[in-house]
Amino acid sequence: NSGGGLGDSIQLFSLILSLQNHFKTTEFFYLGAHENHFEGKLKEYNINIKTLNLGLKYFGFRWWHILFAKKRFLNKDSDKIDLVIDLQSKLRNTIILNKIPHDHFYSATFGFKFCTKKKEYLSNDHLENLSSFLNINIRKIKFNLRNLHEKYKSEAKRLLPDKNYIGFSLTQGNIYRKKNWSIDNFITLANKISEKNKRPVFFIEKKEIEL
């Protein structure tokens, strides 16, 4: 389970690949507050993970979901999940997610109090904590750029041929929220970065005409 923003999904690359590499015969599902970006904007990265769609918009962000999470899951002719991995940090989201039938539950929320296995989780790295949780050593797998289609790498080299770039995302990866920062703040910071011989780059979707 993840918040569902584009940035949230990108940060999951290594975790998903590592778990899929270790548990090769296991079926993985993604449950987020919004669309599964691995089947949409990030599909070119070829990270395959199925969507668990409970039909609850903004899943975990509405208290009334607590009344329907279990029922919607059972209506999918599913019994329970072997392991639920909660990557949120809000108490509300975790409580709602915990309603889905499961054998084991991993969550960093509230000092890991919701974990079904009580241990000392000392790392900020979920993969390290999951290795401890499962009593196994899960090898970390990073995304390999060689897995990207050559046309995307060629386009990246065309747009960014040099080095020392620092990227700014001017829009919110979560389409239901707005950036707290104004465009003026981004420009001010970009100017300061330029003074340090870095090259600011602004990531803007074509549809963002005003920007």
Model-derived segments and their meaning:
Residues 1-211:
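Catalytic machinery of carbohydrate-active enzymes
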